[in-house]
From Swiss-Prot:
Name of the protein this chain belongs to: Large ribosomal subunit protein bL27
Lineage: Bacteria, Pseudomonadati, Pseudomonadota, Betaproteobacteria, Burkholderiales
Keyword terms, alphabetized: Ribonucleoprotein, Ribosomal protein
HAMAP family for this protein: Ribosomal_bL27 (MF_00539)
GO CC, alphabetical: cytosolic large ribosomal subunit
Biological source species: Paracidovorax citrulli (strain AAC00-1)
Amino acid sequence: MAQKKGGGSTRNGRDSKPKMLGVKAFGGELISAGSIIVRQRGTKFHPGTNVGVGKDHTLFALVDGHVSFGTKGAMSKHTVSVTPA
């Protein structure tokens, strides 16, 4: 006869890996063209001048320069721009 109960299976034990979202280059920082500025879900930050948008809403620099954050429009949307260096 068994001295211990059988170790049944559990329905837990899974977790998704971290997605590493957020701001990668901060205001005033010098970055090169193609550098990722913000990784995000949806458009929390909108592209300004010299900033492109990837298919997963990632914002990246189109030119070398300094990053600047600001707001735009009546709804005060957060924008990210790159000023050429």
